[in-house]
């Protein structure tokens, strides 16, 4: 029996991501339908009918799924309570126990998912432990961000660890469950004698880790103005991509070995510096149709919140010493895409050393999922040597068309893993701390960010920055 409890059940994240993901687990029979229950908890007083209807609107079940959805929604309940009052949790426990009586509660597994601001993590997790915890049968699932900087992350860990064991805590970063990010782990280490063999300082000149979004900060002003782009996506999403892109091969695919290698990489990475970073903030678009960040309602007119960041990291280990990793991320960019790009070194001697066009391997995460390798071939239908560019490409949507029809959301995958007790894709406490250590210096720069028009390619000087730090034209 699994009871999946959602704290923050009336919030935007729960509505958009959590409940649709739980429904799809149910629909795909990835949980035992006869003993799976979802309990929502929030402060809002919402009638159960209204709560269930909001989930229906979010899931939008098609005709074929209507009966399955009805079976699912019949197993969803809602409880209104305070987050900081023990009496609310005592009453909720009665509700929980009444639900668990419907199945074999001796085999009950309780998943406590906190979809709330980090400021209440300690309070809520403490009350959960004191009132709802079942020894050996409880898992705490926490959303990012895990703190605001290194110091606060350490303090948060210490407070949560007063009650919860590390092996009971599942810290979510949904980027770890994206198909291409997962596939890249396999692509590297299942092909260690070919692909992974050239991913090192001897063959690679530089690496770009890129996340551009076309959307702005509307609806997230309170969060964004206090945090900025580095806290929002660089310290977590892009750093997780970096780990998969640069880690050494683990001893095994076990959670402990995979996470240990990620930590080894982070420990070997020098902290980001303002000197090697470029921070920006979007302004009104050139056509005047998109408002600038400072024009948004609720934004202080002197705000220095960053909506763009480029920063270069260096890894002091044998594999990557001397290879710059350039992270670049921005809101309201001209084109939205996420990718990892390895730039190969040019030949410095021998045949074709006069060919100076840069070759690269790109792993494209979104919006499309594909792998591209550029290489040099001889121009077809010629008798002499005429080297030209060619591309070897693997497009996931084309090659795995049937499988991709049932594309799974990252949250669905992570919730399934949490229920199964597989922590591999979740973030261990030392990963969190080392990641904050890397980015601490550039989190709250006193400098005014460089302006760039919404819908553009970024701040003035970015092209020169990229050429300088990637080490090529």
Curated annotation (Swiss-Prot):
Example of a GO cellular component annotation carried by this entry: cytosol
Pathway: Carbohydrate degradation; pentose phosphate pathway; D-ribulose 5-phosphate from D-glucose 6-phosphate (oxidative stage): step 1/3
Lineage top rank: taxon: Eukaryota
Compartment(s) where it occurs, according to its Swiss-Prot or TrEMBL record: Cytoplasm
Keywords for the protein's UniProt record, in alphabetical order: Carbohydrate metabolism, Cytoplasm, Glucose metabolism, NADP, Oxidoreductase
Main location: cytoplasm
Molecular-function annotations in GO: glucose-6-phosphate dehydrogenase activity; NADP binding
SUPFAM superfamilies membership: Glyceraldehyde-3-phosphate dehydrogenase-like, C-terminal domain, NAD(P)-binding Rossmann-fold domains
Protein residues bound to NADP(+) 2: 341
Catalytic reaction equation(s): D-glucose 6-phosphate + NADP(+) = 6-phospho-D-glucono-1,5-lactone + NADPH + H(+)
Keyword NADP: yes
Catalytic residues, chain numbering: 237
Listed GO biological process terms: glucose metabolic process; pentose-phosphate shunt, oxidative branch
Binding of NADP(+) 1, residues: 43, 121, 144
Positions of D-glucose 6-phosphate binding: 144, 174-178, 213, 232, 331, 366
InterPro entries from the UniProt entry: G6P_DH (IPR001282), G6P_DH_C (IPR022675), G6P_DH_NAD-bd (IPR022674), NAD(P)-bd_dom_sf (IPR036291)
Gene3D superfamilies per the UniProt record, alphabetical: Dihydrodipicolinate Reductase, domain 2, NAD(P)-binding Rossmann-like Domain
Entries under PANTHER family matching the protein: GLUCOSE-6-PHOSPHATE 1-DEHYDROGENASE C7.13C-RELATED, GLUCOSE-6-PHOSPHATE 1-DEHYDROGENASE G6PD
Protein family according to the UniProt entry: Belongs to the glucose-6-phosphate dehydrogenase family.
Function text: Catalyzes the rate-limiting step of the oxidative pentose-phosphate pathway, which represents a route for the dissimilation of carbohydrates besides glycolysis. The main function of this enzyme is to provide reducing power (NADPH) and pentose phosphates for fatty acid and nucleic acid synthesis.
Name used for this protein in its record: Probable glucose-6-phosphate 1-dehydrogenase C7.13c
Native organism: Schizosaccharomyces pombe (strain 972 / ATCC 24843)
Organism taxonomic ancestry: Eukaryota, Fungi, Dikarya, Ascomycota, Taphrinomycotina
């Amino acid at each position: 029996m699994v009871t999946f409890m959602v704290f923050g059940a009336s919030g935007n994240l729960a509505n958009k991501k959590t409940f649709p993901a739980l429904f799809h687990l149910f629909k795909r029979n990835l949980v035992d339908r006869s003993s799976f229950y979802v309990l929502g908890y929030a402060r809002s007083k919402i009638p159960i009918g209204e709560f269930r209807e909001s989930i229906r609107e979010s899931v939008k079940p098609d005709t074929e799924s209507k009966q399955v959805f009805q079976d699912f929604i019949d197993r969803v309940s809602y409880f209104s309570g305070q987050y900081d009052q023990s009496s609310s949790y005592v009453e909720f426990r009665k509700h929980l126990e009444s639900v668990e009586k419907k199945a074999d509660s001796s085999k009950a597994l309780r998943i406590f998912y906190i979809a709330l601001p980090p400021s209440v993590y300690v309070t809520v997790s403490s009350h959960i432990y004191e009132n709802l915890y079942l020894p050996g049968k409880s898992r705490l699932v926490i959303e990012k961000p895990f703190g605001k900087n290194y110091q606060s992350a350490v303090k948060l860990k210490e407070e949560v660890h007063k009650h919860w064991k590390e092996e009971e805590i599942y810290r979510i970063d949904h980027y770890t469950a994206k198909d291409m990010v997962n596939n890249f782990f396999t692509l590297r280490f299942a092909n260690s004698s070919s692909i992974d063999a050239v991913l090192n300082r001897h063959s690679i000149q530089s690496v770009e880790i890129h996340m551009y979004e076309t959307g702005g900060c509307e609806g997230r002003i309170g969060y964004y103005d206090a945090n900025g782009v580095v806290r929002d996506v660089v310290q977590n999403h892009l750093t997780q991509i970096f780990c998969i892109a640069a880690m050494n091969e683990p001893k095994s695919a076990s959670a402990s070995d995979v996470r240990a290698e990620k930590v080894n990489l982070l420990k070997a990475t020098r902290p980001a510096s303002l000197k090697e970073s470029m921070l920006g903030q979007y302004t009104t678009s050139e056509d005047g149709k998109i408002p600038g960040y400072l024009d948004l309602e609720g934004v202080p007119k002197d705000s220095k919140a960053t909506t763009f960041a480029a920063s270069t990291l260096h890894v002091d280990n044998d594999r990557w010493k001397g290879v710059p990793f350039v992270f670049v991320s921005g809101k309201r960019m001209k084109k939205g895409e996420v990718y990892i790009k390895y730039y190969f070194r040019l030949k410095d001697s021998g045949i074709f050393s006069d060919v100076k066009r840069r070759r690269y391997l790109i792993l494209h995460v979104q919006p499309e999922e594909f792998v591209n390798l550029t290489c040099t071939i001889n121009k077809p239908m010629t008798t002499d040597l005429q080297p030209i560019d060619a591309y070897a490409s693997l497009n996931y949507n084309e090659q795995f068309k049937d499988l991709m029809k049932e594309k799974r959301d990252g949250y669905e995958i992570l919730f399934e893993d949490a229920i199964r007790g597989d922590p591999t894709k979740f973030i261990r406490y030392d990963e969190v701390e080392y990641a904050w250590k890397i980015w601490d210096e550039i989190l709250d720069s006193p400098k005014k960010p460089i302006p760039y028009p919404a819908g553009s390619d970024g701040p003035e000087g970015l092209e020169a920055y990229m050429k300088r730090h990637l080490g090529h034209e």
